[in-house]
Amino acid sequence: MLGVCHCTNCKRRTGSAFGISTYFAKDAVVRQEGDTKVYAFHHAAQNHDQERHFCPNCGTTLYWFVSSLPDKIGIAGGCFDGEGLPEPTYAVSDAKRVSWLSLPSRWQVWAE
């Protein structure tokens, strides 16, 4: 699963107009090395709990867990190097998308 999120939370997390999120089965991802800092909270707008892991040195969001996707791990799109990241296929929280950004018509789009 690869998509973009326009919620206020993702905008603040990335410092951008949206966040790029990739989701994989938890058992398909192997953490290489290093410690992370954790920020846990309840995302009221999407009604789920979230646990974010980020680099304690530079602050980059690395991955997260969402209670509404218990078998998945989310990895920030910016963590992928080069051209290895394919085009997203969906957008969520589209009601909060900035007005100057348009999306491809082939994407699935959810207002919330």
Regions found by a protein language model. Name each.
Residues 1-112:
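A short Gly-Trp-Pro
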